[in-house]
Each structure stands twice: as structure tokens, then as C-alpha cells.
Amino acid sequence: LQMLHAWTNSALVHYAAPDWRETGGRLLGEGALRELRDGRRAASSSWPGRGSSRRWRPGRRTGAAARGCWRAP
């Protein structure tokens, strides 16, 4: 489990690069990219518990990175 955790952290470091939006768009599809684009507006509705954009953005990046790495190993 710790090895998996370290691997996920390295993947997060990779996907949290400055071009993480483009990478996420390629991995998750156009719908997810659109959701990322105007996600700050719909953060409270689609992500309960993450109302503030300051706490919401890193969590959203983590979710995109996790889904991206699992979909394209």
C-alpha cells in the first residue's frame, strides 16, 4: 500500500505540471476538460464540501491526476 501511495504521489507530481489542463483533457475527454474549465463556478454543486476555490482547486487536480493515471497506466 505504501508503494502504491508513493507511485500515486509521483504520478500526481507529473500531472500537476503547468500543462495539467491539457494533459487532463487528453486523458479524460472533452467533457471533463469543460468541467475543469468552468469548475470553479460549479464547484459547490458538483463537489460538495469543497465550496472555496482555494481548497477546491488542488483537490480537483488530484482527482484528475488519479483518474488520468488509472485510465492510462
Swiss-Prot record:
<protein>
    <recommendedName>
        <fullName>Aminopeptidase G</fullName>
        <ecNumber>3.4.11.-</ecNumber>
    </recommendedName>
</protein>
<keyword id="KW-0862">Zinc</keyword>
<feature type="compositionally biased region" description="Low complexity">
    <location>
        <begin position="42"/>
        <end position="51"/>
    </location>
</feature>
<dbReference type="GO" id="GO:0006508">
    <property type="term" value="P:proteolysis"/>
</dbReference>
<keyword id="KW-0378">Hydrolase</keyword>
<dbReference type="GO" id="GO:0004177">
    <property type="term" value="F:aminopeptidase activity"/>
</dbReference>
<keyword id="KW-0482">Metalloprotease</keyword>
<feature type="region of interest" description="Disordered">
    <location>
        <begin position="39"/>
        <end position="73"/>
    </location>
</feature>
<dbReference type="GO" id="GO:0005737">
    <property type="term" value="C:cytoplasm"/>
</dbReference>
<feature type="compositionally biased region" description="Low complexity">
    <location>
        <begin position="61"/>
        <end position="73"/>
    </location>
</feature>
<dbReference type="GO" id="GO:0008237">
    <property type="term" value="F:metallopeptidase activity"/>
</dbReference>
<keyword id="KW-0645">Protease</keyword>
<comment type="function">
    <text>Hydrolyzes preferentially the N-terminal glycine and can also hydrolyze other amino acids which are used by PepN but is unable to hydrolyze basic amino acids.</text>
</comment>
<comment type="similarity">
    <text>Belongs to the peptidase M1 family.</text>
</comment>
<keyword id="KW-0031">Aminopeptidase</keyword>
<keyword id="KW-0963">Cytoplasm</keyword>
